[in-house]
């Protein structure tokens, strides 16, 4: 089987939406029966985004096999059925780390190690490895054409197109076509200059995706085609839309998938986008709305919680309600009190690290428990719920996590001292160990209690969810907390670790150690988020009586 590659680049400015465009195109090709995957190549020198600030980089998306990756991989999984893995995302730092390790071992037999060919060859090898077994692979190059750090990746894909043959390689370039109100027209010159920059590197784009706040007129697309040496039918207008799930239909309506299939000589049926049409219909025709408060510490950048926000929206689709998300800084809860949590239909505390704002999260969990407000805690959101219950119900004054107070009297949450690395080897860590790559990561099995709410929601006794954490419930103190009324609703496959807790005699109080947001999709939703949004809707109705 021959694998075909579409290399996706961006020009003029960043944040044009390369990831959404690539994912949308992949969704159309998948709907034509093709086996599709997507890769993201990031030009920063960090080995992975695992230790990067969420406020700078956005969320870290965790794959089934435990890779800490760029948030664009979350978009990919929400748009196509193919599961991402560590092969789908790598960085400059990872490439240099691999090459330097080989150099130290003597693998290069004394050769002078250079960007070309050693770095570019390493990039090409990873791209080819990631594409094995697929009909079409979309490869998104992070950053903007012209950035110095992107040059090795651009050179690598230029070479790769020659290596595999131009009949199996396409270059798709996203570019900004701004509208100038003073002139009353869109301007194509930035696109021309962006393509000129690509040509100077040796890459002639085959497809141009024109990003604008409005549809780019046919005469302007013809002008772009003429000056950029691209067929008119390969100049695609991608205007702003009110829902990203409309983009597959927008691209298909302009024949982008037909053009690609003809270029690759792929004989496949027309794309059936009925599932996406259903998503768009549900999104546009809600029967009501709810307001859910999300209390976190990185709220100045909503992308830090991208998958959670999307999963809440998916939960809304499954309940035919619009979910309005109110982002609340947990430090504001500390300084202004729980009064700012009033008038919410439900409360969610997502994952996070560090002590800043944690007491505000603990106060939030108490407010939700005592006032019968639906609560969903994720990762740290479960740990603060446990701490709150231990302090205020189980009589364990000043209970805490050793992450925040190492010598506390009741360490109800403690460090995981053993975990398996990406090769399956058991590693031992302590508080002084490196932060990068030293967490419980990836898909883990969980056994659900028969009498639990989550057992009803999932409709199964065993589930698999993705993890990203260093701290866990301390089993040594668990019996006292359970005796006070807390229910352990889910345990790890070996029954050693607490994965889910519930508060009985509460309308809906569920907290999990894993990250359910990573497996939620617009077409299928997720049982926890669907149940949570339903509980929010029911709470709203109770309050209205």
UniProtKB/Swiss-Prot annotation:
Where does the chain bind ATP? 15-20, 72, 239-241
Which EC number(s) does the record attach to this protein?
6.3.4.2
- Kindly indicate whether the keyword Ligase belongs to this entry: yes
> Can you tell me which residues bind CTP?
14, 147-149, 187-192, 223
Q: How is its activity regulated?
A: Allosterically activated by GTP, when glutamine is the substrate; GTP has no effect on the reaction when ammonia is the substrate. The allosteric effector GTP functions by stabilizing the protein conformation that binds the tetrahedral intermediate(s) formed during glutamine hydrolysis. Inhibited by the product CTP, via allosteric rather than competitive inhibition.
What the entry lists under Pfam families is as follows: CTP_synth_N, GATase
Q: Which reaction does it catalyse?
A: UTP + L-glutamine + ATP + H2O = CTP + L-glutamate + ADP + phosphate + 2 H(+); L-glutamine + H2O = L-glutamate + NH4(+); UTP + NH4(+) + ATP = CTP + ADP + phosphate + 2 H(+)
This protein's record includes keyword Signal: no
- Single GO cellular component annotation? cytosol
Which residue stretches belong to region Amidoligase domain? 1-266
Q: Which GO terms describe its biological process?
A: 'de novo' CTP biosynthetic process; pyrimidine nucleobase biosynthetic process
Q: Where does UTP bind?
A: 14, 187-192, 223
Where does the Glutamine amidotransferase type-1 domain start and stop, copy by copy?
291-542
Q: Where does L-glutamine bind?
A: 352, 380-383, 403, 470
| InterPro entries (UniProt xref) | Class_I_gatase-like, CTP_synthase, CTP_synthase_N, GATASE, GATase1_CTP_Synthase, P-loop_NTPase
- Write the record's keywords in alphabetical order, separated by commas: ATP-binding, Glutamine amidotransferase, Ligase, Magnesium, Metal-binding, Nucleotide-binding, Pyrimidine biosynthesis
Q: What class of enzyme is it?
A: ligase
The protein's annotated pathway: Pyrimidine metabolism; CTP biosynthesis via de novo pathway; CTP from UDP: step 2/2
Report the Gene3D superfamilies cross-referenced here: 3.40.50.880, P-loop containing nucleotide triphosphate hydrolases (3.40.50.300)
Q: Name one GO molecular function term.
A: ATP binding
Active-site residues, record numbering mapped to chain: 379, 515, 517
Q: What does this protein do?
A: Catalyzes the ATP-dependent amination of UTP to CTP with either L-glutamine or ammonia as the source of nitrogen. Regulates intracellular CTP levels through interactions with the four ribonucleotide triphosphates.
Assembly and interactions?
Homotetramer.
What more does the entry say? CTPSs have evolved a hybrid strategy for distinguishing between UTP and CTP. The overlapping regions of the product feedback inhibitory and substrate sites recognize a common feature in both compounds, the triphosphate moiety. To differentiate isosteric substrate and product pyrimidine rings, an additional pocket far from the expected kinase/ligase catalytic site, specifically recognizes the cytosine and ribose portions of the product inhibitor.
Give the family this protein belongs to, as stated in its UniProt record. Belongs to the CTP synthase family.
Q: What protein does this entry describe?
A: CTP synthase
- Quick one: which gene encodes this? pyrG
């Amino acid at each position: 089987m021959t694998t075909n590659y579409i290399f996706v680049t961006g020009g003029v400015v960043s944040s044009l939406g390369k990831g959404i465009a690539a994912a949308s195109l992949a969704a159309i090709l998948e709907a034509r029966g093709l086996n599709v995957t997507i890769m993201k190549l990031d030009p920063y020198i960090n080995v992975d985004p695992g230790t990067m600030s969420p406020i700078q980089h956005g969320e870290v998306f965790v794959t089934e096999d435990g890779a800490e990756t760029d948030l664009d991989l979350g978009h990919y999984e929400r748009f196509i059925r193919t599961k991402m893995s560590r092969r789908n995302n790598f960085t400059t730092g990872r490439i240099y780390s691999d090459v330097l390790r080989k150099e130290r071992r003597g693998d290069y037999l004394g050769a002078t190690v250079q960007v070309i060919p050693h770095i570019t060859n390493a990039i090409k090898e990873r791209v080819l490895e990631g594409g094995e077994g697929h009909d079409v692979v979309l490869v998104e190059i992070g950053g903007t054409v012209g950035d110095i750090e992107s040059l090795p990746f651009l050179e690598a894909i230029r070479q790769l197109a020659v290596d595999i043959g131009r009949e199996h390689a396409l270059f798709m370039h996203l570019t900004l076509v701004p509208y100038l109100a003073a002139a009353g027209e869109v301007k194509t010159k930035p696109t021309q200059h962006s393509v000129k920059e690509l040509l100077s590197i040796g890459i002639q784009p085959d497809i141009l995706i024109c990003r604008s706040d409005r549809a780019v007129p046919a005469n302007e697309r013809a002008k772009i085609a003429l000056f950029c040496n691209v067929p008119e039918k390969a100049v695609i207008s991608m205007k702003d839309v009110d829902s990203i799930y409309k983009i597959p239909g927008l691209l298909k309506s302009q024949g982008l998938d037909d053009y690609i299939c003809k270029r690759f000589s792929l004989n496949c049926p027309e794309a059936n986008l009925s599932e996406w049409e259903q998503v768009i219909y549900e999104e546009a025709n809600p029967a009501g709305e709810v307001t859910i408060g999300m209390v976190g510490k990185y709220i100045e950048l909503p992308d830090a919680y991208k998958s959670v926000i999307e999963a809440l929206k998916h939960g809304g689709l499954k309940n035919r309600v619009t979910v309005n998300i109110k982002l609340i800084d947990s430090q504001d809860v500390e300084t202004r009190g729980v009064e700012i949590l009033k008038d919410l239909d439900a409360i969610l505390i997502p994952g996070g690290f560090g002590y800043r704002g944690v007491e505000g999260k603990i106060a939030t969990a108490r407010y939700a428990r005592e006032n019968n407000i639906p609560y969903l805690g994720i990762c740290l959101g479960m740990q603060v719920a446990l701490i709150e219950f231990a302090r205020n119900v189980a009589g364990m004054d000043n209970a805490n996590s050793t992450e925040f107070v190492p010598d506390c009297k009741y360490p109800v949450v403690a460090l995981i001292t053993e975990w398996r690395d990406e090769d399956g080897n058991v590693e031992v860590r302590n508080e002084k160990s490196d932060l990068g790559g030293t967490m419980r990561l990836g898909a883990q099995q969980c056994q659900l209690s028969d009498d639990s709410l989550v057992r009803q929601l999932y409709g199964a006794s065993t589930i698999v969810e993705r993890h990203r954490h260093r701290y866990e419930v301390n089993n040594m103190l668990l019996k006292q907390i359970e005796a006070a009324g807390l229910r352990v609703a889910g345990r790890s496959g070996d029954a050693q670790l607490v994965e889910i807790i519930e508060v009985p005699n509460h309308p809906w109080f569920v907290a999990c150690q894993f990250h359910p947001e990573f497996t939620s999709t617009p077409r299928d939703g997720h049982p926890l988020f669907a149940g949570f949004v339903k509980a929010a809707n029911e709470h709203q109705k109770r309050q209205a009586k």
